[in-house]
A protein has these predicted regions:
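A structural motif
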Residues: 26, 55, 88, 93, ...
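Conserved beta-strand positions in the central sheet of alpha/beta enzyme cores
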Residues: 30, 59-61, 97, 132, ...
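Conserved beta-strand positions
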Residues: 5-7, 29-31, 98, 133, ...
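Glyoxalase I/VOC metalloenzyme domain signal
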Residues: 14, 23, 75, 252, ...
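Active-site acidic/histidine proton-transfer and metal-coordination neighborhood
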Residues: 15, 67-161, 171, 252, ...
Length: 463
């Protein structure tokens, strides 16, 4: 499935949005009309920019309050549609997304709606265009995807298809099993969004609290399994209305979005997300915290060593080539790094004395790194000295590092290989035995980012 995101999901002007979408690695983009209206250029300019960035323009949206209108509004609706078709031809897209009517003037009836969609399909076909029909969860007469599918089915037009939007489906708690019976070639667009479960009206919920897949509470894996049974292989697009996202870094939010789509397709049989889709290694099981590393200067290192000793930790070794000491109690390993070169030194300059890295023992360190990189985590590496072991690592919260170790590679010998044993007697009994959990502090606005980051890479749940 082609990965896509609607421009309404991001902050910034249209050029900034398109640049961020392309840089993140999306295959396509949905153009939201407001972004086009505020752009200082022509629709043709927008289309050229999209193509120059290597993106496909998936759809132009939204076209509102169309089906079921009485005269003279019905005639005007078709006139509006023709003007949208003009824009689409300039933009270079063949798909117009039509939302179910919310106008109090609209008339009900699936046959009436189907007739209108069929006529719109005729007009679109004459210009080589297509129509995708979506049921808004607050639609006046059509608010259920099963009804929007019935309208499309009755319209019986090759240029008229269905939009499945996970928010509108799940906000109404509609059963998902009917999706599997819809022919995949009649689904023209799939829009995915997650959200926390909230008791509020659907419109406000939709406009302010949508989030990326994996950040909310919707059963999106079940949706994807049903979608896979249809044979659908079209765009999988994010349409996210979220106040926080629209005030955050355009590039970071776009990257989170693509990560969420890759994660959404992970492990779903018959689903390949992205034009360069590949099978991911399984989620990493973090067996234990292998070590915690502190970045400090020399004076603080002495004070920290005294504190550790007072807490019952014993110095087990000193690094053979660096100003680094290893302290241990039970299965807890603490590292004090006051070396004047390398990552820890730079981290201390920026952050002051602090934890700069956490090492996690996993089943397979290389596979964990591969999965993390496939999910767009930034890998970390630095120069490795003679006799040292290179540990796989990724960037974590606040620019810190997360290292990966395992039992079946040279990583299991890192303490013996890199450290000279301390000449101290070891006490027989430890009062502290293990690290129970790792807790990170972060800005509130970063919570959803790091939630998705860690739960997509590791076998973790949300509490």
């Amino acid at each position: 499935m082609l990965t896509s995101i609607a421009t309404v999901s991001l902050s910034g002007d249209l050029q900034e949005k398109l640049d961020a979408i392309a840089a993140a690695g999306f295959d396509g983009v949905e153009i939201f009309e407001n972004d086009l209206l505020s752009f200082d250029g022509s629709p043709a300019d927008v289309g050229k920019t999209i193509r120059d960035l290597g993106l496909k323009l998936v759809t132009f949206q939204p076209f509102r309050d169309f089906e079921g209108m009485p005269e003279p509004q019905r005639t005007r609706a078709f006139e509006r549609a023709e003007r949208k078709f003009d824009l689409m031809e300039e933009l270079g897209t063949d798909l117009l997304m039509v939302c179910s009517n919310v106008s109090p003037h609209s008339l009900g009836g699936l046959d009436r709606a189907a007739k209108d969609l069929a006529e719109l399909g005729d007009r679109a076909a004459k210009r080589g265009l297509r129509i995708a029909f979506e049921a808004l969860s607050w639609g006046k007469h059509i608010s259920d995807y099963r009804d929007s599918w019935e309208v499309v089915r009755r319209a019986n037009h090759p240029n008229v298809g269905l939009v499945l939007d996970t928010f509108h489906i799940m906000a109404r708690k509609v059963p998902l099993d009917a999706i599997s019976s819809i022919p995949g070639d009649k689904i023209f667009l799939v829009q995915v969004a997650d959200a926390p479960i909230l008791e509020m009206d659907a419109l406000s919920w939709s406009r302010h609290f949508r989030c990326f897949p994996g950040q909310g509470d919707f059963p999106l894996a079940e949706f994807m399994r049903n979608l896979a049974m249809t044979g659908y292989d079209g765009p999988l697009s994010l349409e996210i209305f979220n106040d926080q996202f629209r005030s955050s870094s355009t590039k970071n939010v776009a990257k989170d979005g693509l990560r969420s789509l890759i994660y959404l397709g992970d492990g779903i049989e018959g689903v390949k997300v992205g034009e360069k889709a590949k099978t991911l290694p399984p989620k990493a099981h973090a067996q234990e915290v292998a070590f915690v590393e502190f970045a400090v200067e020399e004076e603080t290192a002495d004070k920290l060593a005294k504190l550790f000793a007072g807490l019952g930790f014993e110095k087990r070794g000193s690094h053979k080539t660096k100003a680094v000491t290893w302290w241990k109690q039970g299965d807890i390993n603490l590292v004090i790094n006051c070396d004047k070169d390398g990552f820890a030194h730079s981290y201390n300059i920026v952050h002051g004395p602090s934890v700069c890295a956490v090492g996690l023992k996993v089943d397979d360190a290389k596979a964990t790194l591969d999965r993390a990189q496939s999910l767009l985590a930034a890998p970390f590496s630095q120069a490795v000295g003679e006799g040292e072991i290179e540990m796989p690592a990724i960037r974590g919260v606040g620019g810190s590092l997360v290292y990966f170790l395992d039992d079946h590679s040279e990583l299991s010998r890192i303490w013996d290989v890199e450290f000279e044993p301390a000449r101290t007697e070891q006490s027989a009994k430890a009062k502290l035995r293990a690290v129970d959990h790792v807790s990170y502090s972060m800005q509130y606005e970063e919570m959803l980012t790091w939630l998705l980051y860690f739960t997509s890479i590791f076998d973790l749940g949300k509490m």
